[in-house]
Amino acid sequence: MQRGQVQLQGIPFPYSVREQGASVELLKFESSSEQPMAKWAQENMLEGDKQWGIIAQSKTKEETLFLSLTFRKVQRTRLRLQNGRIERIQEEVTEPEMGEFHIKQEGCLELYSYGAKQKTALSKSLTDSFGNDCVKQLFLQKDAMKSLMTEAIEVNSISLTALGNPFFNDATFTGTDPTNSKTYKELAGSGEIKSFRAKFQSGDSDASTAPMIVTVHSNCKLRFFGGQVPVPQSDIEDFAKKVSDIASESEVV
């Protein structure tokens, strides 16, 4: 892979992610250090025997975009023809894993389809350079979750937690209109909204445009499903900004 050939074009959402979806995690980023972001990026370029590093970056007035690369060991099965018989052989191989993250001017860190290993490496690098409390968790309060649901075309499922019931602490409601079910209304007052899955209008509010299916978690983790068509990157970023604007700051990550 040549770094010069890498271009920042956002996450592609091909048909292959239709079932699993593509994730976006929103965090708060506040720097207590005077070190410029450009210097930090230069120091963390992927080189030598580094297991994680930045391979490309781009800057706009609103944000700085980065592509990073790490390596992971996975088990792969290959077939081998031996003495007229097909054998399955398990091998451990090292594979590259690319991730994308954006640092907004207003102090939001967006992780696009970022794996756990990548997130750990990024968090360590940021805290080492900008302070131990520079990255904080964002959280959606119940009213914020309700506000997002009112904007949805259709809510397909909703999960409650912290119900305080002696027999169950969590409950999930599904169906054509789960928020209007009698049981949901009875439990929602005492519990917190853990997550919901809904359809939102995609694009410029054109009714002919296929809706965007999103699962929203209260810890500001989003998962987008394209349905029959890929979800445009611009729609993903617009929705992520809407969520970050109404999120509250929580504990240090």
PLM regions with names:
Residues M1-G107, G115-K182, D238-V253:
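Intrinsically disordered, low-complexity polar/charged tails and linkers
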Residues L111-Y112, F224:
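Extracellular/luminal low-complexity segments enriched in Ser/Thr/Pro
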Residues A162-V253:
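C-terminal interaction module
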